[in-house]
Regions:
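Compositionally biased terminal segments of proteins
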Residues: 1-119
Length: 119
């Protein structure tokens, strides 16, 4: 939901999700880089930074096109003095709809409301 927060959606998140454009079998490469940068490895897909921030890595996103296509569609926003690619609200909504967990249904209310206000 950090992508939503960066786009003005009034929600709180305790972690940052990163979609990695590699096959999932390459997760060791990602974890090795994180470890070299001082992160604590929590699981094959989660690391914790020195300041306690949790990063979640995913290698596919339900309901969306492939990484390359979505990366080209992504919005470029400023985060921590860096330009980062984030999924637009419309794409976050599509993914949340596809996953359909209880927490995703709650997030959809806020995402749709924010999108409506932006239009």
């Amino acid at each position: 939901m950090a992508a939503a927060v960066l786009q003005g959606v009034p929600v709180v998140t305790s972690d940052i999700d990163f979609w990695i454009g590699l096959p999932e079998r390459e997760h060791d490469r990602v974890l090795r880089i994180c470890h070299q940068l001082g992160a604590k490895i929590v699981t094959d897909h989660i690391v914790e930074l020195a300041d306690g921030l949790e990063l979640n890595f995913t290698y596919r996103v339900d309901g969306l096109s492939g990484f390359k296509t979505e990366f080209e569609r992504a919005k470029r926003l400023l985060w921590l003095n860096r330009r980062v690619a984030v999924l637009p609200l419309e794409r976050l909504i599509k993914s949340k709809e596809a996953v359909g967990r209880a927490k995703d249904r709650v997030h959809l209310v806020y995402l749709r409301q924010a999108l409506k206000l932006k239009r």
